[in-house]
Amino acid sequence: MIFQTIRQQQPLIHCITNYVVANFQANGLLALGASPVMADDSHEVEEMVAIAEALLINIGTLNDRTKEAMLLAGKKANTLGIPVILDPVGAGATVYRKETVHLLLTDIQFAVIRCNKGELAALVNVEWQQKGVDSGDGFIDIETEATLLAQRYNCIVIVTGEHDFMTDGVQSQWITGGNSQMTEVTGTGCLLSAICGAAYSSGEDPYSQLVETLTYYKKAAELASAFTEDIGDIQIALLNALHRLSKEGEASCIL
């Protein structure tokens, strides 16, 4: 089981991420047995990524300083064959974000793009009403557009929501399950992106490893929601569920 594999391998995941979710991401990776490092200064990111198993680039609180660090770290990771994950948070909310994501996609070869449907719309230029960094409203053919995006950038595209869609441009599938409480707190999607980095780097079949990751992340959400109905406790419950899954495997899925 992929979460157990992550615990066994203990990959170091370099996260250049946003300050809203950095603590939650770090604790989520630790819950699975991975090691997080959140370095984002341009003076050290190339050195730091060189000792990591994967790099996460998350643009949630984007600024010029972290933009430079993202480009440096991403290019270095490409040189070293280290997988890079992109979380284009709120990509369609502003021109600055959209232009930055385009630059990142042009200059860096990403292994995975993990987004919601509003962010997917921004990446493929489909009209969409973005609501800040949240998904917003509109219509998009997720299967078609995600597949074309995966083919264009030669990567795996994961579009998360009530149901998750994943494709590498050839094979694809939907993953169901989860719980709506995950949308009522910040950071659950951002944490998933970090976990995708840990999963991608923990075996020889990244596609299958990511399918399993999405499946068991939804199982973790179900376990967490079964533990509490109080929204203030859901993040803690999710961390506990991830920890249990990484130690006990599928046995812990029995509610």
Swiss-Prot record:
Co-factor(s): Mg(2+)
InterPro entries the record matches: Hyethyz_kinase (IPR000417), Ribokinase-like (IPR029056)
Source domain of life: Bacteria
Gene Ontology MF annotations: ATP binding; hydroxyethylthiazole kinase activity; magnesium ion binding
Pathway: Cofactor biosynthesis; thiamine diphosphate biosynthesis; 4-methyl-5-(2-phosphoethyl)-thiazole from 5-(2-hydroxyethyl)-4-methylthiazole: step 1/1
Catalyses which reaction(s): 5-(2-hydroxyethyl)-4-methylthiazole + ATP = 4-methyl-5-(2-phosphooxyethyl)-thiazole + ADP + H(+)
A GO biological-process term: thiamine biosynthetic process
Record key words, sorted: ATP-binding, Kinase, Magnesium, Metal-binding, Nucleotide-binding, Thiamine biosynthesis, Transferase
Binding site for substrate: 38, 187
E.C. numbers: 2.7.1.50
Family stated for the protein in its record: Belongs to the Thz kinase family.
Functional description taken from the UniProt entry: Catalyzes the phosphorylation of the hydroxyl group of 4-methyl-5-beta-hydroxyethylthiazole (THZ).
Protein name listed in UniProt: Hydroxyethylthiazole kinase
Species in which this protein is naturally found: Lysinibacillus sphaericus (strain C3-41)
